[in-house]
Amino acid sequence: KPFGTMAAQSIGAVAEKELDNGTVVVHGVTGLERSLDSLLFGTPGLGGSIQLTNGIRTWAEIEPQRGYDIVTTIDIRIQDILETELRKKCAETKAEWGTAVLMDVETGEIKAISNLRRDNADSTYHEGLNYALMGFEPGSVMKPISMMIALEDKLARFNEKIPTGKSFPYAGGRPISDSHAYNSLTPAEIIEVSSNIGMAKITLRGFEKEPWTFRERLAEIGMFDPMNLGIYGERIPLIPKLGNKNWDRISLSRICYGYSTRIPPIYTLMFYNAFA
């Protein structure tokens, strides 16, 4: 690898494998090396040899063919900056791991992607798992996505004040709360102050009677579409399928602000890139 460990999890790694006939081949096992292995591997050559009086003479019966070259969208200069800044931020916050991805707003191309994990032995950070593609509970970064659906479905007006307060004891579940109490908030203010109560109340306006339709709306805007990045290990978001029980309504009121879900960070980036 000419650039060392930069974007190592996404570019991937290779490993040798010995075939039954003793031939050693090299195949991709992670990242692009694995997902594009059929293009990168090429075709091994076949050779034969004959014992002559003056030694062994070997010739190739079928010449090996090189695999294809591939060109990624990674910009190595941006990659270097991104990885350096992620390492600084991880060290500053003493994070166990961190991921950062930079996407071109106009094209959606990935220009840089970094995944770092802390080595507990010396507290330094090295390339870890491809966290950008793994599902995690996103929390409040889900709210703008839910709000986009709410505004498209006209569940709230831009200048409308939504009563919030500090606690919302909904449907017999654990009360929804905010860290700060506000009497009422507009949709923009709900996003600005990250109000769980405001987001839940707006979402329930449109989906309380049929909770499962919220997931259907997420599907309509591409939440479960494969991104087809070409990187082995891509996952799609996991959001529970809801029914028509009281518990499903409670789950809906949590899902809309990012709880009870597992969404890869790169999907969150995709939606935020669309907002931009």
Regions found by a protein language model. Give the residues of each.
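Small/polar-residue-rich segments within soluble enzyme cores
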Residues: K1-R66, L269
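Beta-lactam-recognizing serine transpeptidase/beta-lactamase-like catalytic domain environment
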Residues: S49-E61, A100-S140, I145-A276
